[in-house]
Amino acid sequence: MAKGPVSTSSDDELPFETQEPIAADERSFFGGQPQKPSAPNARAALPASLAGQEHYHGHRERLRDRFREQGDAALADYEILELLLFRLIPRRDTKPIAKALIERFGSLAGVFGAPQALLMEVKGVGEAVALDLKLISTVAHRTLKSELRTKQVLSSWSSVIQYCHAAMAHETREQFRILFLDKRNVLIADEVQGRGTVDHTPVYPREVVKRALELSATAMVLVHNHPSGDPTPSRADIDMTKVIIDAAKALDITVHDHIIIGKDGHVSLKGLKLI
């Protein structure tokens, strides 16, 4: 009979029994520190696998201490991600995984915006970890959206851009989204009306206006992304926007703007005086 709890995960199985201080350490970001060896030469007597475990647990505590005492400004992006991965992958050195994710996707935003299938292409990231990363991304998006619901959209334009960028900038396919507003310009609904290819998504002006009527919306903000990263509008983007504006105007529905989101910025068709 085992004397203590033993890992049952095939990915994380260890050739030794898990000690209680380590288990307590993994229950939270700021759990108790692992027990120190009782004798100066105790580390030297440890098996190689145990010595490696002790090393990265010490690294985890140092990283937690820096975050606790100095905040996120003291940590690089990969270290923030590493802190998170401590919880998702509790018995493995997560620094190489965090660095590989940042290298593959370019930034924290890129990691959290990446599709699950692409996340799982990174060595060390399985389905469970990829799903957890997408869950965290969803929480962030919903937080930003909830802030929009309490504000007048036109007077909180920076919040609109921040939300749209978080939701769409790292999508690998074009996505056409509409923010439906009431007569006070408060958000009624945020809906994705279409998903397409890497450089095109079908848009049906009649369906756009029909949905606005169903929601009793009196105004809209159109948004779509360019997976290439360049938010410069195409002639098709401009023409399609004008068709929607004309269809909506006939029913007293205002189109305030059409925003195009890229990885590193955005473009407003109204700001460019194209509509």
Swiss-Prot record:
Single Gene Ontology BP annotation: proteolysis
Domain of life from the UniProt record: Bacteria
Domain MPN residue range list: 153-275
Amino-acid positions noted as binding Zn(2+) in the UniProt annotation, renumbered to this chain: H224, H226, D237
Cited InterPro entries: MPN (IPR037518), RadC_JAB (IPR025657), RuvA_2-like (IPR010994), UPF0758 (IPR001405), UPF0758_CS (IPR020891), UPF0758_N (IPR046778)
GO MF terms, alphabetically ordered: metal ion binding; metallopeptidase activity
Motif (JAMM motif): 224-237
Region annotation (Disordered) ranges: 1-45
Keywords: Hydrolase, Metal-binding, Metalloprotease, Protease, Zinc
Entry's transmembrane regions: none
Family, similarity comment: Belongs to the UPF0758 family.
Name of the protein in its database record: UPF0758 protein RL2068
